[in-house]
Structures are given as C-alpha cells and as structure tokens.
Amino acid sequence: MTAHATADTGLRGLDAGDLERVIEIDRTPGGRTRRRFFEKRFAAAAAHPEEFVHVGVMRGGALRGFAFARLLRGEFGREHVTAVLDAIGVEPVSRETGIGRTLLHELIARLRAVGARTLHSQTEWSDPELTHFFAAAGFKLAPRVALERSLATPLVEQIEED
Amino acid sequence: MARDTLTIPERVGDAQEISYASPAGPNVGALARDRIPVRAMKADDLRALVAIDRRIVGRDRSGYFQRKLAEALQESDVRVSLVAELDGHCIGFIMARVDLGEFGRVEPTAIIDTIGVDPDYRSFGVGRALLSQLIVNLRTLRVERVRTEVDWRDHDLMAYLERFDFAPSQQVCLDLDLVAAR
C-alpha cells in the first residue's frame, strides 16, 4: 500500500494505519461493523499490492472517505483486467459534500492507470441513494443476475441425474 | 458465477481457521452426494482444478485458479470449498466463501464463486452432489443464504440453479465501462 500523504487535505492510497478509521466510517447506523472483512482486505492488499487499487479522501487532517477495488485477471473468461468495487464509504457527517464523487473519480483514474477496463459493483435494489450514486457515475445494469437461495429450508432431494 | 467454473470465507489466522467442508453424516440417504464422494478442497487440488477448467474453456487459467484457490483456502474464515472425486480422480469442484462477522458469528450470506465439472462426467450428478453438500454444510454453519452471480444469457445455468431453489436476489449487478466512460 502507498504511504500516507503529507498534505492535510487531498487524495492518497490507504495503508494499515487506516484500518480502524475505515471500519468506523463503514459502521452502519445500527452500529454493525465489517471488521473481519476489512482486516482481511487490508492484509491481502499489503501481501498482494498489485491486486488492489484503493484511495482515501483526507479533509481537516482526517480520513473522511475511502474506496477499495480488487483487480481480477482471467476471470469471466476474459484476458483483460476487470476490477470489483469491494467497498466505498464516506463518514456520515461528510456526505452530500462531493467526497463520494471525488473518491470514485480518483479510483477510476487509478484503475485506468493499471489497465482495468471494467469496474463491477452490486447494490441493493432498495437503496435508492446508492443506486442513484452509481447511475450518476455512469454505471449501467450488468449482463449478470444475482441469484440467491435461502438456507432456512433444506434441499429437497431425490436420486436423479444432472 | 461463471458457468464453467463457480469460491467462499477468509481467514482470521491459522489458529482460528475452521474447516466445515467435510461431508455430511451417513443419515442422509442415497443422494447424489452419497454416490459422488465429496471432500474439502485442498491446496494440492490446484492442478486438477486447472485441468478441469482447461477442458471446459479451452485454455490454461493457472494464474487465475492459483489466486482463487489461495482466496478460498487462505483468506477464508471458514473453508467450505469442495471437490468431487470418483476413483481417486477429481471430477468437479465448487469454490465458495463465508466469513466470520462480529463476535465470531458467521456472516449471513455465503458466496459461490465458481463451479466446474469435468465434461466427461456431466451426466453423473456431480454438480448436484457438490451443491447439495455445500448447502448442507452452510446450513450446519447457520449461514442464512447463499448467493452467486450468473450471466443472464446463460439460461441453462439459471434453470439449473432454479432446481436448487435459487431465485433473483435484491442485489443489482452494475458495470462501469472504464474504456468508454472517459
């Protein structure tokens, strides 16, 4: 990961020192965190920096937002580099101030710089704020469908062939 | 989820790593997973996985599978990826992830990344055995749901997954063309 920028405000890569702040920014209104997810992402990014692109926005000497993308090579049967937006977040008091757009703009620039040609993401259908954010950034509906199965019920099985 | 190839968990540390990918007990009847032995995926399965994938897609994706296997085995909190064997040979695999959340509880959603079946064994119920065992294992872990992504043009795969009670989720898949969107 890149070193911290020295400027009080601006854009920079993330490093291990940002872990707790990122977890805090990502905390849900209900208080739930994704500590394990971010611990693993930061560890993986430190071990394999060539597989991650990340950016943070500094204001007033503090990290106000972050974006994390993972690079995939050879997935989806393609040779070109694809990126997956793992996480993006802006602290609640700094929302509606353009930080999200700045983050995504910078992330896209960094992804292009490493040769990524597509950025994949997912959002909840019922989250109009995030859906609008992605739409305004130029995202389109992907030719993929997210399928889900509840595990509340067991699989009804019988002997049969595929 | 790629049709040809479909991964799950990440790791806290070796001491905390748990494997729940073992097959179910003997009280489940003569189901697909009983006829096709299914076991936990191991690091030395890489060569077999790459060979199956090569037969499906027609090219070598060793690098890609090396990363996916490392992700499934080393970055996962809970190892749930499986391999199907017949006569000692790997004939299929499913790569999936499920993470530990707060207080050591598993996250409610598991992700299936890749499933692959040797083309010579497509009528042997290998995919069913793998999916069936994965669902049993995830239910044992008290995971609430399992999710995957499928190319919307792959009607066969979508129909296949529907047979396992998969249905559209409330997640919307989005793409940004980084070449065009300048």
Go through each PLM region and give its residues.
Chain A
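Active-site/acyl-donor-binding loops of N-acyltransferases
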Residues: 137-156
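Conserved GNAT acetyl-CoA-binding A-motif
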Residues: 111-123
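Conserved active-site alpha-helix within GNAT-family acetyltransferase domains
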Residues: 101, 113, 125-143
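Conserved beta-strand-loop-alpha-helix junction that forms the acyl-donor binding cleft
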Residues: 95, 121-130, 148
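Short coil/turn motifs at secondary-structure junctions
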Residues: 72-74, 93, 126-128, 152-154
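Conserved acetyl-CoA-binding loop-helix of GNAT-fold acetyltransferases
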Residues: 90, 96-109, 136
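Conserved N-terminal entry element of GNAT/NAT acetyltransferase domains
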Residues: 1-17, 154-162
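Acetyl-CoA-dependent GNAT
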Residues: 13-17, 24-80, 86, 91, ...
